[in-house]
């Protein structure tokens, strides 16, 4: 990478981190700890060069793999990456942009070949050591072979349709005024919703309060706060709770 950067007269920054050590220290998966380490590296680089945004090279093939990966983990809907996301790293905001999300790997390779631009692949992407890599290297090629066609375009189309549906549902929920003045869910109103709308309302509330990895199973447990009077508290990730008290549902 350094040689390529020098060839094109570009600045380069490299970093090294022991992901297995981070897994032992923090208890996270390999994917989670590697992602957190990357975000920390990006934040350090942004601070060094006084940048407010960092551009990433995720492309359409990566997006399809992400949607499939999240679906198999039990995500709520067909969840993929967003063009722009903001993360908190050591108490400071880091904005990540993905301008190539609608561009396929094939299109990128064709562009590089047409312009005779040398590039470097990340060698770790060819190793079947993570779930995502195995999806890319084993599962997706097998599905392509079974169906006799490339499956990524179909996954991407389904994800776009799902996102449009979620946006429409969000508009409907916003008009229903489901929150009290303190921003808590008002139980008498949310209890009247259909199960599908109620799950969407809870999902929106959790997401707005920074809850990650919102699965179907988690939403089902959160719904029990509304349907089962005997339940008053649900465990959330990162040591937080969703509680029901005085006809209000809120995070603590």
Regions found by a protein language model. Name each.
Residues 125-133, 153-163:
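Internal, active-site/partner-interface "lid" segment
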Residues 48, 74, 142, 205-208:
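Active-site catalytic microenvironments for nucleophilic, acid-base chemistry
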Residues 17-19, 37-38, 85-93, 137, ...:
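AMP-forming adenylation/ATP pyrophosphatase catalytic core
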Residues 24, 129, 149-152, 213-216:
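Non-catalytic, surface-exposed connector residues within folded enzymatic/regulatory domains
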